[in-house]
């Protein structure tokens, strides 16, 4: 029996959360090693297993993979979530690129000042509802299927659901003008593996709190202020 993937990151969302989502949607159990001290991080650095001296890092199939996109590409391909041919893969990459951009606006959110959080929240909601959600609403309308690409679940669907839920944490009715996305959210959330991941007690991480921010700053020695996009 193959060993479970091992995820090295902080006990919070950050860049690892999309990896957790993808593994969970594929029905893959995984283990996690949480970075909690500077000494622990330096030990990893000294071991040489962090190719570019940064996390996320995932041990899978005898490899120690870094770079979030490379990790996600591998998982999507391994578990048949990356389309049936090159054309579908290109569409998946394009749609994931869009949701990546949207979620990127939220990645730094926990590290912002209270004043900047208010500004960034309004910025994210505006971008989501004026640029990104209309685009995916149109994709669903034009494609006419239950999924964004082809007629089966792909990484693009999983990533979009993750992005939708993140935006709804900032504005609960963000999907009010997008009926196809509302139906999409309900449909994808009902897939058994995803439903399990969304249920209490899963390895899905909550909204990052002050403890998470403090840990990341301490481990990475982040002594600078983070500014909104």
From Swiss-Prot:
Glutathione binds at residues 9, 54-55, 67-68. SUPFAM superfamilies: GST C-terminal domain-like (SSF47616), Thioredoxin-like (SSF52833). Its EC number is 2.5.1.18. It is an enzyme of class 2 (transferase). GO terms for cellular component: cytoplasm. It catalyses: RX + glutathione = an S-substituted glutathione + a halide anion + H(+). It is found in: Cytoplasm. Belongs to the GST superfamily. Alpha family. This is Glutathione S-transferase 3. It comes from Gallus gallus.
